[in-house]
């Protein structure tokens, strides 16, 4: 199914469902980089928030609708748990439904501030990870050069 058809179907699905205040398509489908294994990635703001059961049911309905796997994340969780992903959703995502533009702009602003406020921590974490990886590789290569002598 082509990107335009997926977008049309998703808009038609969410439009009458008042519980969904914000729906954003992101990922490979939003970028137009659809491959056979691509899934449909959506970020939603529902009032009230979806339970796990409701989230799983929604993903199943969307998979049937789009003919491919669907991953749905709740924006309120994404903002705090994964600020880099939330930032990408707001930066590159395609809004499919925005009930209140002011609410969307406030949420975007909160996500961007949180992303920028935590950027230093992500860089620090990345630096520690690379250093640990470098030490591990150095340890592995020295172990290879110190092979036991034949008796």
Protein language model regions, located:
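Catalytic core of pol beta-like nucleotidyltransferases
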Residues: 1-19, 31-32, 47-151
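Short gly/ser-rich loop at a beta-strand->alpha-helix junction or flexible surface loop bordering the NTP-binding
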Residues: 21-29
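Short hydrophobic/aromatic beta-strand micro-patches
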Residues: 43-45
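Short glycine/proline-enriched turns and hinge-like loops at secondary-structure junctions
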Residues: 35-38
